[in-house]
């Protein structure tokens, strides 16, 4: 399928007469693609340029040589490489909420720390704006999705960023940049390299490239939104294909529920399905951290068994007697 059919949403169109068409595109993207790309999303080009510059410089100064040493050892024993248990990527993680760890990440200079904090603030605002647009599309009360995400004991979502580089790979037929998976969380916002491609999603049994567009933010639906919408929105398999040329930058930020937030299908959506006599199976109810504990072990496996495991846990918990003393 041509990349031109990939859903690209100009957020400026949400302000005027073309809003209905833009909202229809958003709905189609969430229901049938699990991915879309945003233009004119409110994050300045100047800030995105700084984010790209500080992260590429950080990789060059502190991580490139380490990765070359890892790659050399890996390729020297290529006959022993298990491609199902290896990703060709260099990564580090930043946590923003409920508490930040940016000051503790080694080798980050003050400019990089300040830039990434500023970027995180802008992404948080964009994620919350998107959640309200999704509420509008779903017919849910404004703020519903954010309240679910912030429904844990600290009243905050979990929000963090994975900073990745995918260096040139001499054996892309053997090793994936990142193996196929769905994302466990809520809504994912990706600032990707606009010069080196590699991100692909699975649609209709075909791997489709997510087009690298300058100054865009790629958004994808995580497993938790699939549960909350009772399957109306879908998280989809995606992967990164290793490239022989170029170093691909990927900065993915995950706006997820709080660790002890309880996730369950929105009652209003379940009731609407019942009224319309849609006989859909209802997704399970669980604590987000319980799902994450399973996901950590099963990330690169199908999502459906994870949902079934949560459903089994829900049945066991509901069958236990309630303490009276």
Curated annotation (Swiss-Prot):
GO terms of biological process kind: ethylene biosynthetic process; fruit ripening
Cofactors demanded by this protein: Fe cation
Gene3D superfamilies in UniProt: B-lactam Antibiotic, Isopenicillin N Synthase, Chain
Catalytic activity: 1-aminocyclopropane-1-carboxylate + L-ascorbate + O2 = ethene + L-dehydroascorbate + hydrogen cyanide + CO2 + 2 H2O
Coiled-coil regions, chain positions: none
Enzyme's top EC category: oxidoreductase
Annotated positions binding Fe cation: 181, 183, 238
Domain Fe2OG dioxygenase as annotated: residue spans: 157-257
Native species: Doritaenopsis sp. (Moth orchid)
Name assigned to this protein: 1-aminocyclopropane-1-carboxylate oxidase 2
């Amino acid at each position: 399928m041509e990349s031109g059919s990939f859903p690209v949403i100009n957020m400026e169109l949400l302000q005027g007469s073309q809003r209905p068409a833009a909202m229809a595109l958003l709905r189609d993207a969430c229901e049938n693609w699990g991915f879309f790309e945003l233009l004119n999303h409110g994050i300045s080009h100047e800030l995105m340029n700084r984010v790209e510059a500080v992260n590429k410089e950080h990789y060059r100064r502190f991580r490139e040589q380490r990765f070359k040493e890892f790659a050399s050892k890996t390729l020297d024993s290529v006959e022993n490489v298990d491609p199902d248990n290896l990703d060709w990527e260099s990564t580090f993680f930043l946590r923003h909420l409920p508490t930040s760890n940016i000051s503790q990440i080694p080798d980050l200079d003050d400019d990089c720390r300040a830039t990434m904090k500023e970027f995180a603030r802008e992404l948080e605002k964009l994620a919350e704006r998107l959640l309200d647009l999704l509420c509008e599309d779903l017919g849910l009360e404004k703020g519903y999705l954010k309240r679910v995400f912030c429904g844990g004991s600290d009243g905050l979502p979990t929000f963090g960023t994975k900073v990745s580089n995918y260096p040139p790979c001499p054996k892309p037929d053997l090793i994936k940049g990142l193996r196929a998976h769905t994302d466990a969380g809520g809504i994912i916002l990706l600032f990707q390299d606009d010069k080196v491609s590699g991100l692909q999603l699975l649609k209709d049994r075909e791997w489709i490239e997510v087009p690298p567009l300058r100054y865009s933010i790629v958004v994808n639906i995580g497993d938790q939104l699939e549960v909350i919408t009772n399957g109306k929105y879908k998280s989809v398999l995606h992967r990164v294909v290793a490239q022989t040329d170029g170093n691909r930058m990927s900065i993915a930020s995950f706006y997820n529920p709080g660790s002890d937030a309880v996730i369950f299908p929105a009652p209003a959506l379940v009731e609407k399905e019942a009224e319309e006599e849609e006989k859909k199976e209802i997704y399970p109810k669980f604590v987000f951290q319980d799902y994450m504990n399973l996901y950590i072990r099963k990330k690169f496996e199908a999502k459906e068994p994870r949902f079934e495991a949560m459903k089994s846990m829900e049945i066991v918990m509901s069958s236990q007697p309630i303490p009276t003393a």
